[in-house]
Amino acid sequence: MAFAENDEVSIYFETFGNIADPTLVLINGLGNQCIAYRSDFCEMFVEAGFHVVRFDNRDVGLSSDGPEGYSLKDMASDAVAVLDDLAIKKAHVFGVSLGGMIAQTFAIEFPDRCASLISVMSTTGDSDVGRPTDEARELLLTPGSTRRDLAIELHLAGKRVWGSPGHIDEASERTFAGEVFDRACRPMGVGRQFKASRADRSRTERLRELDVPTLVIHGDCDTLIDISGGIRTAEVIPHARFLEIKGMGHDYPDYFWTNLVSAVREHYQNI
C-alpha cells in the first residue's frame, strides 16, 4: 500500500497506467473512498492515454484523520502531497461534488501544479446556486451509521434520492456499499469534511482569476447539487467549457463512463 505524507496526515493512494503519460488525479466527493472511482472506470482513462491517480481524502478510507478545523485548501494540499510522492510536477485534476470543490481549490491555490481542471457535479459555493432539493438536503444531513446493515441502507437511500434515474442497480449498489463499509467505516470523518466545505463559502471571485483550461460537467437530473452550480462555475472561470449530460444525477454509473472519458480526452486534446 502506498501513502503520501502531508505534515501529520497520511494519504492512501493508488495508480493506474504509465507514469510517463499525462497524469489525471481523481478527487472524491463527501465521504467517498477512492474505490468509488471503480477500477474499470480508471482503466478506461488509461486506455484514453492517461496515468491515473485515485486516493482517499483525509478522514475517509485508509487515509488518516485530519486535525480539527481543516479547510478545502488543506484537502487540496493532500493531492499535492500525492503528486510530490510520485515526483509528478503537474496533473489534470478531476473532482466530483466535494471533490470538484477541492479540485477548484487546487487550481486556485496551486496553479503551478494544475495542468487543467475538470469540475463535475459541483458548484462555486455561492448560496443562490447548486442548491439541493429538500429531500436531498434532509438525507445528506442524516448521520452515518457504524452498523453495516444501516450504512448500506443509507447508501441505497441516497441513490434513490439523487442517483441517475433509470440507472440504479440496487443489487450492485448494495454489494458495493458493503465493500465500502468493510474497507473503512468512519462517519465522524465525513462530518469534518462537510464542515470544511461549509467553511469555504464562495470561491467565485477566486475562480474569476483562474488561468487554467477548465471543463465543467453536470447532469440535468442532479437533485443534490442543482445544475445551476455547474452553470455558474463555467460562467465565472475564464474560457471554461460546460457540458450538460442528459439523464445524469448526482452520480456517474457505468452508463455514463464512455461519455465522461471521451469528454475528458477531448478536453485534453484541445489544450
Where are these regions (language model features)?
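Active-site loop/oxyanion-hole signature of alpha/beta-hydrolase fold enzymes
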Residues: 60-94
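Short beta-strand/loop motif that positions the catalytic acidic residue
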Residues: 210, 216-218
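Catalytic active-site module of serine/aspartate enzymes centered on a nucleophile-bearing elbow/loop
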Residues: 240-271
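Conserved HGGG/HGGXW glycine-rich cap/lid loop of the alpha/beta-hydrolase fold
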Residues: 7-65
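Flexible "cap/lid" loop of the alpha/beta hydrolase fold
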Residues: 117-146
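Acidic catalytic loop of the alpha/beta-hydrolase fold
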Residues: 221-225
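Active-site nucleophile elbow and catalytic-triad environment of alpha/beta-hydrolase enzymes
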Residues: 190-206
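Conserved alpha/beta-hydrolase catalytic His-Asp/Glu region
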Residues: 151-192
